[in-house]
UniProtKB/Swiss-Prot annotation:
Disulfide bonds: none annotated. ATP binds at G8, R9, A10, G11, T12, G13, K14, S15. This is ATP-dependent helicase/deoxyribonuclease subunit B. The gene is addB. The lineage of its organism: Bacteria, Bacillati, Bacillota, Clostridia, Eubacteriales. InterPro entries: ADDB_N, DNA_helicase_suAddB, P-loop_NTPase, PDDEXK-like_dom_sf, PDDEXK_AddAB-type, Restrct_endonuc-II-like. One of its GO terms (biological process) is double-strand break repair via homologous recombination.
Length: 1158
């Protein structure tokens, strides 16, 4: 009976010493038990190491245990296993309920207890109390002595939570910390380990409970040997001493044996021998000794074992690591299992490491736990509850359906059904009660109901069948979950819903079988483990809180809190693979080569300073009062220092330290102080970078097949551009050509070099087939011609190939335009029927008629989007205000005008009144233009008839002569030309152009420095909604448009002003009759030019660019054309900024005439 301490710095062979002693004992045929105790996370690795060192005899004669396994053995042998051990899930769920029940009586934690994450913090504090033997009695004594009021209140509330938790827990359970307390009790009367020889390895400190267990073992065992990582024993220590934590542990152990009267069998100093791990490596031995030595010594010998690499970013960093690993394996005969990669936060590096290592064909295992929240089963459960608690939203429904756990929707066919369903749901705004109703709408308009075809009826019938299959079990689940129930009842309902109603558990079994058959071990493990975790959490919840009454949302909170405590460990899929992990989890286990990545300031060592519920100051006060708890943040800084020291002493032969200059988000980063320290203690080490590498490897770019192919592509590109490349690339190229798997890819590379996204013209025959209607005519609108002028390729995709966007149930700008136009047209018809004149309309008339028209429109179309929600009801009221304001302005404009409204919604190409505009092309084909004019006004003056076209717009628009010249704004001139050409049929005599104007439909917000009178408001509104466009430069005609226009004034309703002399002021909106004629000629020639290009199959990727306005910014097809202005062949069609007089001159030159823009 006695304690022996085996000590030495990192790499001195402490673990190997223990294993060798066990091996020696086994060789001598021991009669007593041989036990090696290590931390829980190292049991598997240690078992492997012992098995490799000793062989099968180890299994019969020795055991590798953790304290947890030790307790399990004692309870099984000597009793104590009567109460179930509660896992972290049950513990967290119980704490949640305790906090809920105590919440209103709390002061300090009342608000915090409802915050996400507080349960974990509270759980850690309870665990800490138990680890450090803080019980109710200790808390009472300490609280009475605390003078700090805030800490006193905090401790009183913590005591209440602690006591309530223990009271409920001990009704039938113990937690893991109680295990050690129970183990202490049981060891007193248990002879299981009497006479055993015990080694305790890999611990830097022990909790009070663990120390108590060690004390009990010391009394019963033949010997207890404990390893400690220390430079020297019985030496003075300061808090900055690298080994302060282990020296404190040594002190506690010595105090323990003195108090218990146990013999001390002395020290074994492994520092006296040559470092076991670094005996063949001077540089690594020097790092171990001098990394934290003050003052330090320098090593000026040759450096072969340490590399420092400064990476541009994380991708460059990991690619360097991958290439170097392959170099070690190929040239130095390393095995992948001899290599480890470690960092401070493996989560940050997981994705980039996985991607690059896969590319370089490096087998690897990431030693980390993964969150189960994204597993399909957990998503399925949460989204099922979200569906019924959040009113059947689109997001929750399709999360639920896309998990793949409903058997009807598995596989490709199931996915296609979901896609079809999703398209309908998005197009028709299905949510809430609409899921419970039969779907009958299949109209293309979101504002009006339409007749549907037989084909669409069949689609609807199929969709309704799918809907029924989805809704029926969910609706039943919803009804069962109404109101408050016990947690046990909710658990039963949920499990029956999953297992009996939907066969989800059976579906998971099928997935597991499929994954196993296809060598997908990780996926198979995830699916069956998460299912078992869910069942376990459900059972724990029932055991702990089964009789608690709650509603569905509270039940899901409890369940998710339990599930959140579980993380799933990944399993190694091969024996020979690179080990990747956090520095806190990876220990030296035959690691010949080590890569420490992400060695940046604030990252390694970590700068994290989370205090938890108890601050550093609180802990100091409690320590003064006799309560010793876990480390404060200051102590953790020095513990982090020891962690770094441990990490840098893992490698046996080769160490690589890397850091990126920028993080994953592109933010700059500095190297860690460790990098500077390494440069000081090893002055001969040279820092490498992408442009400077010490390892002379002219074949560095030849690595794994895929990255080598990428490098080959770059080399081929250089050669294609005339640059010199290394000779070996032709042999690499030949190798890929000989390999069937890669030959096709090489061909793609070659084609890629010749690739251009420029499109060849399609044939005239193909263009006709694409653009002709079912009557073999090419009929189109002016807006489509303008679209072609913007970009021929976009037109080809939209109107030739008939590409369509996914239909979404939303009110878009075109929908708004259609709605406003329709109401204005109905308004005009209404006042005609009532024999009212525009000029006689009052504000009340306007409001009443508009309200009635809008209400009828919405009422008569039940499926209209304006009936779908309160939000759209608000929009409807807003539309009423806008339309009312607009018709009032139109009324005022008509009062001030001698022009009269002749017709609304005048169609050409759709009626007998106005024929389509026929465009005869030079090549012999004909195009037919159809359109609809919002409003035509007429004026009879001095025996002549003048026509004025008004185009309603929901946004601001002015006539731009430059856009017109380039075919981007032709519509009003085309309409005018059609009217003038057909005027004898329309107005029964030849008419002349009076104006083409835009009217903005709006209820403008007025800006003013002070209050305005009613008259001033009226004037400001008229100014804001002034008609914009071109007017005939004739004072009589202009005066007829605004009969209030007087000499020396500006019109409030049209873009014109009158000089004091009575003639019109200079204004680019005023053009002569000859100029109107010129524009009409030009627009016809421009349309013919556009149509000729269209029929000839020109589909150039040539988007227009005017100043900063680029057509591509609003194009839905940019991902198809892949236009890139940086490519040599990709060019914008630039619309240069020109003066109006220069444009008039160009128009003159194109169509003839002597009219200028002056």
């Amino acid at each position: 009976m006695g304690l022996k301490i085996i000590y030495g710095r990192a790499g001195t062979g402490k673990s190997t010493f223990c294993i060798n002693q066990i091996k020696k004992k086994i060789n001598n045929s021991p009669t007593n038990k041989l036990i090696l105790i290590v931390p829980e996370q190292f049991t598997f690795q240690t078992e492997n190491k012992v098995l490799n060192a000793i062989g099968e005899r180890y299994v019969l004669n020795a055991e590798v245990l953790s304290f947890k396994r030790l307790a399990h053995n004692v309870f099984n042998e000597c009793g104590g296993a009567t109460r179930t051990i509660m896992g972290d899930a049950g513990k967290s769920m119980l704490i949640f309920k305790v906090l809920e029940d105590l919440g209103d009586n709390m002061t300090v934690f009342k608000n915090a207890s409802r915050q996400k994450g507080f349960i974990d913090i509270a759980s850690k504090t309870i665990t800490e109390f138990k680890k450090y033997n803080v019980n109710n009695e200790v808390l009472d004594l300490t609280i009475n002595e605390i003078e700090d009021e805030n800490l006193k209140m905090k401790m009183e509330e913590l005591k209440d939570v602690f006591n309530e938790f223990n009271s409920r827990l001990h009704e039938g359970y113990v937690d893991e910390e109680d295990q050690l307390l129970l183990l202490n009790e049981k060891l007193d009367g248990c002879s299981l380990y009497d006479g055993a020889e015990i080694w305790i390895d890999e611990f830097s400190s022990f909790t009070p409970n663990q120390l108590s267990v060690i004390g009990k073992l010391l009394k019963r065992a033949k010997s207890v040997n404990i390893t400690l990582s220390i430079d020297e024993v019985n030496s003075p220590k300061g808090e900055s001493d690298l080994f302060v934590a282990t020296k404190n542990t040594e002190k506690r152990l010595m105090n323990l044996i003195q108090e218990e009267g146990i013999a001390f069998n002395g020290y074994i100093n492994l520092n006296e021998d040559i470092s076991y791990r670094f005996k063949e490596n001077k540089e690594l031995a020097h790092i171990e000794r001098q990394l934290y030595a003050y003052p330090f010594k320098q090593y000026r010998g040759k450096n072969n074992s340490l590399r420092l690499y400064r990476a541009n970013n994380n991708y460059d960093e990991i690619e360097f690591v991958a290439k170097d690993i392959l170099r070690l394996v190929r040239e130095k005969q390393y095995r992948f299992k001899d290599i480890s990669v470690i960092c401070r936060d493996v989560d940050n590096y997981e994705k980039v490491v996985s991607a690059i290592f896969a590319e370089y064909e490096i087998p690897y295992y990431i030693d980390k736990k993964i969150d189960i929240a994204s597993n399909p089963l957990i998503v399925f459960i949460n989204s099922a509850v979200d569906i019924i608690s959040k009113n059947w939203t689109y997001e929750s429904m399709f999360k639920y359906l896309k998990t793949g756990l409903i058997k009807e929707f598995r596989g490709i066919e199931g996915a296609e059904l979901i896609d079809e369903l999703e398209n309908y749901v998005l197009a028709y705004g299905i949510k809430g009660k609409k899921w419970m109703e039969e779907w009958v709408n299949y109209s293309s308009s979101i504002l009006k109901e339409e007749e549907i075809s037989e084909e669409d009826k069949q689609r609807l019938e199929r969709l309704n069948d799918i809907r029924e299959n989805i809704v029926t079990p969910l609706d039943e689940f919803n009804k069962q979950c109404k109101g408050k129930k016990t947690l046990k009842e909710f658990a039963t309902i949920l499990y029956e819903f999953l297992d009996s109603k939907l066969d989800v558990m059976d579906t998971i079994d099928k997935y597991v079988d499929y994954f196993k058959e296809n060598d997908m071990a990780i996926e198979a493990k995830e699916y069956y483990e998460v299912r078992d975790i869910f069942i376990d959490v459900l059972e724990q919840a029932v055991d702990v809180l089964g009789n608690e009454v709650m509603d569905l949302n509270e039940f899901m909170k409890v369940l998710n809190i339990g599930l959140s405590q579980y993380e799933m460990g990944l399993i190694p899929v091969a024996l020979d693979q690179v080990n990747i992990g956090d520095i806190t989890r990876i220990k030296s286990r035959g690691t010949k080569a080590l890569y420490i990545i992400g060695v940046n300031d604030g990252v390694l060592p970590s700068a994290s300073k989370e205090e938890g519920i108890l601050s550093d100051n609180d802990r100091e006060i409690l320590l003064e009062k006799g309560i010793s708890l876990a480390s404060d943040t200051r102590t953790k800084i020095f513990e982090e220092q020891f962690l770094v020291y441990t990490a840098f002493t893992i490698a046996e032969e080769y160490l690589v330290v890397t850091y990126p200059l920028a993080d994953f988000e592109g933010k700059s980063q500095r190297p860690s102080i460790i990098v500077h320290r390494l440069k000081k203690i090893l002055p001969n080490v040279k820092e490498e970078s992408e442009g400077f590498k010490l390892v002379d490897d002219k074949y560095e770019k030849i690595s794994a097949k895929l990255p080598t192919l990428n490098e080959l592509m770059i080399a081929i590109r250089k050669n294609y551009d005339g640059a010199e490349i290394e000779d070996y690339w032709k042999y690499v190229y030949d190798w890929y050509l000989r390999e069937p798997k890669w030959k096709e890819r090489i061909e793609y590379v070659r084609k890629g070099l010749e690739y251009t996204n420029l499109e060849n013209n399609i044939s005239k025959e193909k263009a006709k087939k694409l653009y002709e209607d079912n009557k073999n005519k090419i009929s189109l609108s002016v807006s489509r011609l303008e679209r072609y002028a913007q970009c021929p390729f976009a037109y080809y995709i939209q109107y030739g190939l008939k590409a369509k966007d996914r239909k979404i149930y939303e009110f878009t700008a075109p929908d708004l335009g259609s709605f406003m136009h329709e109401i204005l047209d109905e308004f005009t018809n209404e006042i005609k029927e009532k024999d009212l004149k525009w000029s006689d309309l009052s504000k009340e008339n306007c409001r009443n008629i508009i309200n009635s028209l809008v209400d009828n429109q919405v009422k008569n179309n039940k499926s209209s989007i304006l009936n779908s929600s309160k939000r759209y009801s608000y929009f409807t009221d807003r539309f009423k205000r806008i339309l009312t304001k607009s018709v009032m302005v139109i009324s005022e404009q008509m009062k001030r005008s001698d022009f009269e409204i002749y017709k609304n919604e005048l169609a050409f190409g759709f009626s007998k009144d106005v024929n389509s505009i026929k465009l005869d092309l030079p090549s012999g084909e004909s195009f037919y233009l159809n359109g609809r004019i919002d409003r035509v006004d007429k004026l009879n003056l001095d025996g002549e008839t003048y026509l004025r076209i008004i185009d309603y717009k929901t946004g601001s628009k002015k006539f731009d002569l430059n856009k017109f010249y380039n075919g981007l704004q032709m519509q009003l001139l085309v309409y005018l030309d059609a009217l003038i050409n057909n005027s004898e049929n329309i107005v029964e005599n030849q008419a002349m152009p009076g104006a083409i104007l835009y009217f903005r439909i709006d209820d403008p917000i007025l800006k003013s420095k002070g209050d305005l009178t009613e008259e001033e408001i009226k004037s400001e509104v008229l100014k804001e909604l002034k008609l914009e466009g071109l007017l005939l430069d004739d004072v009589k005609v202009v005066k007829a448009m605004d009969n209030t226009l007087e000499p020396g004034t500006h019109s409030l309703i049209i873009p014109a002003n009158m000089k004091k002399a009575g003639d019109l002021g200079k204004n680019k909106a005023l053009i002569t009759m000859e100029q109107f004629e010129l524009l009409r000629k030009y627009v016809n020639e421009k349309m013919v030019e556009i149509c000729q290009n269209m029929i000839e199959g020109k589909i150039d990727i040539e988007p227009c660019k005017e100043n900063k306005n680029i057509v591509c910014d609003y194009c839905n097809y940019s991902h198809i054309c892949q236009f890139d202005s940086s490519l040599e062949d990709n060019r914008y069609k630039v619309i240069p900024k020109k003066k109006d007089e220069d444009i008039w001159k160009s128009i003159n030159e194109k169509v003839g005439g002597e009219v200028n823009g002056d």
